[in-house]
């Protein structure tokens, strides 16, 4: 049996450094943080969104409303996932109408998760603007015309490789690794 090669790309300190940079970019672009809300895409995007909001609050002193969204039933491939997809809760405890929503996910790959998240958001209102923040952009792998506004890092991979973001909240450690078959 062949072993999968695991290549570390970013450690916990690197993830923290990236989140600080992303927070500063958001603050710089949005001089008025009042209309800003942050929504994380389940699962790891939720934890990254909370960390990003906490980092913005530490830097700027202003708390940003944070929520999370499950996109399972909005995916265009959900029937391929299985007959009983696991649907998680969506928690958006604030209006998003006329707000700037920063949608947060761990990895931008084909763009299909982001498309599903945009579809899901419309069930909760009509934001003035939606921006996308990702920890990792798998450069050159897009199937849809979607691009992140805030990127932690670009990683070049081939389609057979997997980019995994590990977070202490779900995985017991913080790291970004590329798994090669």
From Swiss-Prot:
User: Could you name the domain of life of the organism this protein comes from?
Assistant: Bacteria
Top-level EC class, please?
A: transferase
Q: Which reaction does it catalyse?
A: UMP + diphosphate = 5-phospho-alpha-D-ribose 1-diphosphate + uracil
**Pfam families membership:** Pribosyltran
Q: Does the keyword Cytoplasm apply?
A: no
Please list the GO biological process terms of this entry: regulation of DNA-templated transcription
Q: Which InterPro entries match?
A: PRibTrfase_dom (IPR000836), PRTase-like (IPR029057), PyrR (IPR023050), PyrR_bifunctional (IPR050137)
State the Gene3D superfamilies in the record: 3.40.50.2020
Question: EC number(s) of the enzyme?
Answer: 2.4.2.9
Q: Which GO terms describe its molecular function?
A: uracil phosphoribosyltransferase activity
Please explain the role this protein plays, according to its UniProt record: Regulates the transcription of the pyrimidine nucleotide (pyr) operon in response to exogenous pyrimidines.
The family annotation for this protein states: Belongs to the purine/pyrimidine phosphoribosyltransferase family. PyrR subfamily.
Please identify the protein, giving its name as recorded. Bifunctional protein PyrR
